[in-house]
């Protein structure tokens, strides 16, 4: 005896009155056919939904796993200025070198990929990362409350102080408070610009430390702010430079790597934090610090 389908069983369970007593057999067959079509359509619809859900889930996973995407591509796209010695700059052979270059290369190696460097002006670095053109910015970026609202920061990989520089014959500016009503030059949107403005200075936008020192020497600006270690490095290369350091911030700034905020960067953030911890533990960060700054800035003093 043939096994009844669910539709056939349903038709048998319905009373004859349901079919109005006319041509019951024919109407039962019509009912069975109609129900069969509806059932098949339902199965197909559910299958389609399932396929779409699976595809959406797969796409979502890919989007949410930035680290996986980077490792599949085999490259980590790093944005930096390339004109801020000793963080990132071009040596005599025009090779891109510097502390941030080597730190990011060591991190990329820990992730199992190759670094790809993209050079840009300071105020374009974050816009490029926001647009998805870069995976991260490694450019001596100081962690601030304002930046932390927009970006997720890694563990700090070095610590610096902001120093105030003036011409050697300037005895008027001795503290940050003396900047009120004065003119400084700094990269636009940098923490140095923000600090100078907070003390009442007018800031002229400039791209490189070299240009800033030239403006200072020419008397076109009254002072400038930058990382203490950047000034020390400049004086090592240019011992006769016409400027002196008169003040520096008491608390050290934390320098870290910003990533686009959100779940998409979570695995990448964890992986970079692990890499930084390992590079600090095995002495790599200390070695690179001493190579480029003449001192260890990888630990907070």
Where are the predicted features?
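Flexible hinge/capping segments at coil-to-helix
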Residues: 167-183
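Ligand-binding cleft/hinge of the Venus flytrap
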Residues: 88-93, 104-113, 189-208, 235-239
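Extended ligand-binding regions for polar small-molecule ligands
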Residues: 50-52, 56, 101-110, 170, ...
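A ligand-binding cleft/hinge motif common to bilobed small-molecule-binding domains
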Residues: 141-149, 195-198, 222-252
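Periplasmic-binding protein-like
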Residues: 159-166, 232-273, 295-301
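Extracytoplasmic small-molecule ligand-binding "clamshell" domains
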Residues: 59-140
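Short helix-initiation/N-cap motifs at beta->coil->alpha
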Residues: 117-127, 171, 189-190, 204-218, ...
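N-terminal secretory signal peptides
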Residues: 1-26, 30-46
């Amino acid at each position: 005896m043939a096994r009844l389908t669910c539709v056939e069983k349903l038709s048998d369970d319905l009373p004859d009155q349901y079919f109005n007593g006319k041509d019951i057999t024919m109407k039962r067959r019509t009912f069975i056919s109609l129900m069969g079509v509806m059932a098949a359509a339902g199965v197909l619809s559910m299958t389609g939904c399932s396929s779409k859900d699976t595809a959406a889930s797969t796409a979502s996973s890919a989007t949410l796993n930035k680290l996986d995407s980077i490792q599949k591509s085999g490259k980590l796209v790093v944005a930096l200025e390339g004109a801020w010695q000793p963080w990132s700059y071009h040596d005599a052979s025009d090779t891109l070198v510097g502390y941030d270059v080597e730190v990011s290369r060591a991190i990329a190696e820990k992730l199992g990929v190759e670094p790809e460097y993209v050079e840009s002006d300071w105020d374009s670095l974050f816009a490029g990362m926001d647009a998805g053109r870069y995976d991260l910015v490694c450019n001596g970026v100081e962690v601030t409350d304002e930046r932390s609202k927009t970006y997720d920061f890694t563990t700090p990989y070095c610590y610096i102080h902001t120093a105030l520089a003036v011409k050697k014959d300037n005895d008027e500016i001795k503290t940050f408070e003396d900047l009120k009503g004065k003119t400084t030059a700094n990269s636009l949107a940098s923490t140095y610009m923000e600090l100078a403005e907070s003390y009442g200075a007018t800031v002229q936008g400039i791209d490189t430390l070299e240009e800033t020192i030239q403006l200072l020497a020419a008397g076109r600006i009254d002072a400038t702010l930058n990382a203490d270690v950047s000034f020390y490095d400049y004086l090592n290369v240019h011992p006769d430079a016409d400027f002196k350091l008169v003040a520096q911030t008491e608390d050290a700034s934390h320098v870290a790597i910003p990533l686009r905020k959100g779940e998409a960067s979570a695995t990448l953030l964890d992986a970079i934090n692990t890499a930084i911890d390992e590079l600090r533990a095995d002495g790599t960060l200390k070695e690179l610090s001493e190579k480029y700054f003449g001192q260890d800035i990888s630990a907070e003093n």
